[in-house]
Design a protein with these regions (language model features):
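Bacterial N-terminal signal peptides that target proteins for export
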Residues: 1-11
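Repetitive helical segments and hydrophobic/amphipathic motifs
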Residues: 13-14, 153
């Protein structure tokens, strides 16, 4: 599937989701129940206008990798990021997080985002898909306050294995299955992205790794 086709598909899906959100049946809610919005995380990632740049604090590499998997695997669960009806919490690694991962894996510290992206992409679509799904927890969105209160809890990811929440009073850390590298931290100044919708996200400073190979 070509990139243009993927973007067209995502744009169409966003329009349909918006229409559903505005329909009378969608706005009807149970008494006392808060109705969450349907804005998908692909809109937050801005898939229509993303590009490599010098800003390592954003999500360009993550966006490219997600679109790669969507293109290579039309039935991948990664597509759920584009479906605002699917409730989830996603932990989003920054471009700098991928830079640290590539350096740890290859010993090379790339400056340009494109080279970092290509190094991760070289792991193969199956591995990239597995890693991306390991950053997604399906179910009711978990806001940062609840995450902090969930110290010691194991969260089951869309990949199938778990990540453990660890909060020491100042740092919110996510413990993955990789025992060789430092566990990622949640960047507490960049949490609750897309709050009020079925899909929320929190920024992390490292890439979560499931068991690979």
């Amino acid at each position: 599937m070509k990139l243009k086709r993927i973007l067209t598909t995502l744009t169409t899906a966003a329009l349909i989701t918006s229409a559903v959100a505005l329909s009378p049946s969608a706005t009807a809610q149970e008494e006392g129940e808060t109705k969450l919005g349907l804005n998908a995380l692909t809109n937050v990632l801005n898939v229509a206008e993303y590009q490599f740049d010098s800003n390592l604090a954003d999500f360009d590499i993550l966006t490219y990798l997600a679109l790669d998997v969507m293109g290579a695997k039309p039935n991948s669960a990664v597509w759920a990021l584009a479906d605002g009806n699917v409730k989830m919490t996603a932990f989003l690694p920054t471009d700098r997080a991928f830079k640290k991962l590539v350096k740890a894996l290859t010993g090379t510290s790339y400056v340009r985002e494109r080279k970092i992206y290509l190094a991760v992409r070289a792991l193969g679509f199956d591995t990239v898909e597995k890693v991306l799904l390991y950053h997604v927890v399906l179910g009711a969105p978990i806001l940062s306050e609840a995450a902090v209160a969930a110290n010691g809890a194991d969260l089951t990811t869309a990949e199938g294995s778990t990540i453990r929440v660890a909060f020491d009073g100042t740092t919110l850390r996510l413990r993955d299955k990789d025992t060789k590298r430092i566990n990622p931290n949640v960047i507490l100044t960049r949490v609750d992205i897309n709050e009020g919708n079925n899909q929320v996200a929190h920024t992390i400073n490292g890439v979560l790794l499931p068991k690979l190979g």
